[in-house]
């Protein structure tokens, strides 16, 4: 039998968002297991960076990843390709954002690095008015946003 490769997008295809909480539906997990049991391979093909492909996604049984809109490719745990933005370009963007008081984050294989005010701002957007709304406060206290939990705040963004 001929082996096939099945490519899944992440957002809205493999991963669902129910009430702001990302998860892989059981039906998708079963489909991946069945596909792999037939000897086929399962790859992710997504615009997400490596750092945004959380463990709960990979635990479904993924054979490879085409991430960052094609800027990152791995088979198993072996990186085959990684297209980086130059340090000069990163520094230019960071300087512009900081000078103009933009909140932002920088994606890399090693993490999602947030500007100093971004996490607080995103918590308000994702969780709601947690200071005045009891439901928003309960959600805020759970800290159940994979994205917010992945953000690393307070690191130097400029690169040499």
Predicted regions and their residues:
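Short loop/turn microsegments at loop-to-beta-strand junctions
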Residues: 2-4, 61
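Short, basic/glycine-rich phosphate-binding loops at helix/coil junctions
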Residues: 7-8, 12, 72-74, 158
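Short, structured loop/turn "capping" segments at alpha-beta junctions
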Residues: 103-105, 138-139, 158
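Intrinsically disordered, proline/serine/threonine/tyrosine-rich low-complexity regions
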Residues: 154-155
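Acidic, His- and aromatic-enriched active-site or binding-groove loops in soluble protein domains
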Residues: 121-150
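A short acidic/small-residue loop/turn micro-motif
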Residues: 22-24
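Active-site phosphate-binding/coordination module
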Residues: 28-131
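Asp-based phosphoryl-transfer active-site loop
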Residues: 4-20, 44, 93
């Amino acid at each position: 039998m001929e082996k096939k490769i099945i490519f899944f997008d992440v957002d809205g295809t493999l991963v669902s968002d129910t009430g702001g909480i990302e998860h892989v539906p059981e039906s998708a997990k079963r489909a991946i297991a069945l596909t792999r049991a037939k000897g086929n391979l399962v790859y992710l093909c997504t615009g997400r960076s490596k750092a945004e492909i959380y463990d709960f996604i990979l635990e479904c049984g993924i054979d490879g990843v085409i991430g960052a809109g094609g800027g990152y490719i791995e088979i198993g745990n072996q990186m085959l390709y990684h297209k980086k933005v130059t340090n000069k370009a990163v520094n230019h963007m960071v300087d512009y954002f900081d000078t103009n008081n933009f909140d932002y984050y920088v994606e890399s294989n090693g993490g999602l690095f947030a500007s100093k005010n971004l996490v607080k701002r995103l918590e308000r957007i994702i969780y709601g008015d947690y200071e005045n709304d009891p439901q928003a406060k309960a959600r805020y206290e759970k800290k159940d946003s994979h994205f917010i939990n992945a953000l690393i705040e307070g690191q130097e963004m400029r690169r040499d």
